[in-house]
């Protein structure tokens, strides 16, 4: 659970887990649940209501055959999918950790499957529900909006729109209708999400639709983007066509917390494999702003979080003058190897892994040239020109990030810069990596404090 402190998390018991074929607390048998898949959360008083997807084995398939980890990426497999709800009446009561790690949180009340009226457009196997409160003059009595994927067959899917007055009974309006100017990719969509935001330029309220598609040649495995406009019924009127939201190697399937200022985080890596060293990493949470129909992403509070909670995270931020030349940032590990290079020029920013694998994002004219490089564990996140452009990449390294080397060449200048390091990195830079060195340093500090108090030395 997200803490009140920026980028901090409270450890909690699992909220919802598969039932392993056991009856629920009321003694009702539901059949063996194979997986629980994420969906959406909406605030309810002091608590929250959860929308999630339960999978069961289809037909004669066994639970083992229907587990998501054993099914090729992007395929339905021998599974059925059902959207259910759960309620956490009071979030603060759910922060206690029980002694038995195998049990779900007893404060969570599973409410069962939602009811779906699909008489106007039949659907089945709905997944990835995104639920928000959304006013639509065409449906004044149904103030809740859901968009979800309807799995058509083993590999195809369609985004559909549903409305509800009470979050339990839902009516399918039909498939999401987007005009040609939306410029969506023709491939199968993944993980649609929607939020409503106010554009800072026009003060107009806009709906922002996030969709992920398979990547093409020279792109990452999956490419996430957004479309801006207004949704009424199932028709989406577009004001900003599909725009890639992150140009790095590995950002995909973003989740968005619908709030006054929406917060987004994404998966780092399309699908875990044995070739990778990390799995199921998340990007840093990003505060979203809509300005002139374009999204800006900001890691507010990240320097404080790095100093307070992290051992190996590192942030470097700078204001640049790159009308000519380039600014290059080499990321080195503790063996001195350059494991990533970030390059910033007047019209592009790029990330290169191990000197050979590059992703590049175009830059528009901006009021100022700024660059932020955020490193934590295996993840490198780059924010350019105030968050107008981002690149997120996993860095394949067998050792920890140690330092950065910054160069301005060809007439480029670094006007100002700031860096923040995690606790272990600061100890490394101070030569205090061993317990003996740390004890000696603390002893010297105590002696110095005593001498100052005794008047032997002046504090200045």
Predicted regions and their residues:
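Carbohydrate-active catalytic/glycan-binding domains of CAZyme proteins
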Residues: 1-460
